[in-house]
Amino acid sequence: MSTVEPNAYDPQQVETSAQQFWDATRAFQVDENSDKPKFYCLSMLPYPSGALHMGHVRNYTISDVVSRYKRMTGHNVLQPMGWDAFGLPAENAAIKNKTAPAKWTYANIEHMRAQLKSLGYAIDWSREFATCTPDYYVHEQRMFTRLMRKGLAYRRNAVVNWDPIDQTVLANEQVIDGRGWRSGALVEKREIPQWFLRITDYAQELLDGLDQLDGWPDSVKTMQRNWIGRSEGLEIQFDVRDTTGAALDPLRVFTTRPDTLMGVTFVSIAAEHPLAQHAAKSNPELASMLETLKHGGVSEAELETQEKRGMATGLTAVHPISGEEVPVWVANFVLMGYGTGAVMAVPGHDQRDFEFANKYGLPIVQVVKLREPRNDDEQAWDATQWRDWYTDKSRELELINSAEFDGLDYHGAFEALAERFERKGQGQRRINYRLRDWGVSRQRYWGCPIPVIYCAKCGAVPVPEDQLPVVLPENVEFAGTGSPIKTDPTWRQTTCPECGGPAERETDTFDTFMESSWYVARYTSPNARDMVDRRANYWMPADLYVGGIEHAILHLMYFRFYHKLMRDARLVDSDEPVTNLLTQGMVIAETFYRDADNGGKDWINPADVEIQRDERGRVVGASLIADGQPVHIGGTEKMSKSKNNGVDPQAMVAKYGADTVRLFSMFAAPPEQSLEWNEAGVDGMARFMRRLWVQVHKHVGEGIDDELTKIVALGGPLSAEQKAIRRKTHETIGKVDDDYGRRHSFNTAIAAVMELSNALAKFDDASAQGRAVRQEALEAMVLLLNPITPHASHALWQVLGRGETLLENVPFPQVDAAALVRDALTLAIQVNGKLRGTIEVAADAAREQIEALALAEPNAAKFLDGLSVRKIIIVPGKIVNIVAG
């Protein structure tokens, strides 16, 4: 029996002891040789930034709770962990700290692994890997060479953000107000060769597959559907003429609104379009404009918000119906990477075209009207004022100013135009996707080398598989003004594997989404010689994936796509990588600041602030602890370095213990909602942990023996109070089981256990039967909390006389249906549907007895005075409704 004093809950001692037991017994290592049903649960792997933040803690605690619960319900559970270790932050840190990215990364992994272990997660560490190691990325290099041979990987020119000072490509998020984040130089749009994967070949399958993902949030599936962006329309040919009237290569444009074709008053093309380049040769002013348009970012979001700019090229396009010539303009909101790089401009019914036409004085024509306008605003049409109905095709529309197509609705016009263009060879029906092929080239150093060799004679040649991996040199000096491998001739220069002549290696590296697109499968067989082995089909698809909704599009789309590539390579059997997805909310915290001399804000960490709150816990005042002077209250925002409102998990674990931190992170909010960090709430969880500790030790102090655990089942009749505690215990078991297993509602599970604890605190029956009832309740509480507070549960199980064991191997408590049966029921009494009182009846009371008691209930009788009872409706166990008149 434990010798720990009742008031001596020492989280550090308890947690160290439990973790040592788990490590010594290799408690969470699993294999495939089990007759239990498998359950594969994981969180999105972390980037080794150097320290965990509270978002990590919440994420990994959610998956750990589910993993431990599933072990207790008889599953063979895999919960692995690894490191998404390539990427830009390591390069930035290398510049700042004057160290190699590899050294910085590996040091961070060591530190963060220790942090994760301190939180007691049930992780199979034997499967750990870092994606920056050659024995990991060799497999994606091999896959890439196979995709090259199948035509699913290809190279073409693409527009990127180019920093002319640092001589490097910038990610969209590194372009701030059109300038490089580090150099401050005006960013240029530059066209360079890049490698792509043909995700568009899988667009329809990716779209259709969403219908099978019943365990994914609808919000994520909607975002993916919108990103794939399937649309049906027409591809229409516009003949093009130069200033002399000579014919040039025709333009082909795709439109989902062929009904607005007669409203085309100009055609827009991208600055990089061959026709724009052709026109600029004889037009210096246009050439200057094209040079200007090279500056600024290339992200879709930036294009949507930037000022519309453009210039006439001098070229004209021939309208395919009217034969009229309309001008061809260069416009900065048209990109070569989207569609054909050309757009038919209908300013009367497209807002971007409308804004552009008004700016440059181009004609605007109405060609569609609403058949049933709801108000005067919808009846009027104004070429100077945009209204949303101009582009609304969800309403009943009618074509006007459209020659022989007048009077047709959208569908009629679509069919008529499609038939005409297909008959004349001027166009065709097409299904188009917003989704674009995945550009996987990055002009950065710290990434997986792309396994391609360039030969003057043979062109781009995949590195032979027996020469893989192409290893990234790690011991480099990194200054940030270019990639070390680009300037290292001993690494770059090689021999062509086909002709034996001199050749050079590709110096671009893979987009880091490549590594995170297949790691879930690698966990299943981390030591396999190929990408995965047969063990993958035992574990895949994963049963639960936990991560932020911010990954809904890019990571989760590439993740699904790459899994299909692996399936088609016969590496896995499943169509999708994950069956169920849980997207946890952000961790938010209060912010405080003082006005800075430069007009900005100096953000102050909440730990450095003395906070005054009202009776509802709202912040009503704040001052800096250091000087006692007031600080501004900035509101509640996502924890971030920029707002300096982060909380160090390590400090919280040191102060309160891992179990308390885990408990608060699960109790403060449902998983899908934002969690507001509140240390007063953490204090509350710490008090509950101490109270539970005392409850168990006080009970044990009264003495326990082997027979005590059997008395409930074997003993005589229970008193009403004993029955009430047993009923509460088993009601709690049923609720927590449902909250963990079906609803993932961990906060309500904790609340239910707290209610049981409160009820037990009022139960002071010292009889053998009473102590047996208490023993059963305490054992249930310890087991119910084990997924969330595993260290304390490990210790308290021993205190309760059950010995030291892995609680995940102890079956999750089961509801005893007999314990839920009530001797008496409380029924609500309604008179004509309104609540008038309650009555207590025996659980097996006859209908006649219930009716008599209901009619005699004093308050109900008062409202029945002078009325005749027409009907009595009894809802068993709940309500008696007396209908009178």
Curated annotation (Swiss-Prot):
Pfam families: Anticodon_1 (PF08264), tRNA-synt_1 (PF00133), tRNA-synt_1_2 (PF13603), tRNA-synt_1g (PF09334). A motif ('KMSKS' region) lies at residues 638-642. Transmembrane segments: none annotated. It is found in: Cytoplasm. Keywords: Aminoacyl-tRNA synthetase, ATP-binding, Cytoplasm, Ligase, Nucleotide-binding, Protein biosynthesis. The keyword Ligase applies. This is Leucine--tRNA ligase. It comes from Xanthomonas campestris pv. campestris (strain B100).
